[in-house]
Amino acid sequence: IKTDSGGQGSGAYEKDELQWTQYPNECHIAIFGDQTLNSHKVITTDKISYAAGRNRSQYYQMNWLADDGYVYVFSPSYAKTMSDSRQQTTLPAGVVRIDTKAEEFDAAYYYNLEEKANGASFLRTWYISGNYFLLLMYDRPFSETGYTANQLAVFKAGSEKLTYVSGLPSTDIISGFGNTLHVENGKAYIAATTTDGNPAI
């Protein structure tokens, strides 16, 4: 609990406040009525933790409108890394979806991504097309030290399959992936950087 107000930007906090997330075992989504942002409703699910990828001061998009009309909401369960037990989530990394017509979470839809990734989570997500999403995966669970996001996997909504991408350089030499995904003719392109050569797609 903070004894004084302080911080800046997303790190700002008020006196007597528990900084950062107050509800680690819930995900809250605001749905705005139009582009003026004057009216909105908030919907909540307790199936996943908050839907935001984190890397230091960077926040990454986790909500994507797919061709089937649903908004898929991914949570990497980053709150597992919090030092204060009151801010740690007990929920695994997973995905839920929002019915855009009802403007509510689809109560029947939930997929445990962490279970299919041997306990690992993900740093980023991108929408490809159809029911396909690309995930930048960590190499080990948050409970272990030295976890690094150096693998890619494709999640297919509908069949709920998580498939790791093969044919990439060894994870020992991958130093990063591009920020932007390019999709053309059903194929997704992303830059990969290695420690022993120039970036490649």
Regions found by a protein language model. Give the residues of each.
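Long, well-ordered mid-to-C-terminal structural blocks that present hydrophobic/aromatic surfaces
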Residues: 73-146
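Membrane-embedded hairpin module used as a gating/binding unit in multi-pass transport
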Residues: 25-28, 46-100
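Structural signature of eukaryotic scaffold interfaces centered on beta-propeller domains
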Residues: 1-4, 56-71, 77-80, 119-132, ...
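Long, acidic/polar, low-complexity amphipathic helices and coiled-coil-like
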Residues: 1-66
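Short loop/turn segments that connect beta-strands within the blades of beta-propeller domains
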Residues: 25, 67, 91, 129, ...
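Beta-propeller blade signature
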Residues: 9-38, 86-103, 148-160, 200-201
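Surface-exposed loop and turn segments in beta-propeller and other repeat-based domains
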Residues: 36-59, 101-122, 158, 163-175
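C-terminal structured domain segments
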Residues: 162-201
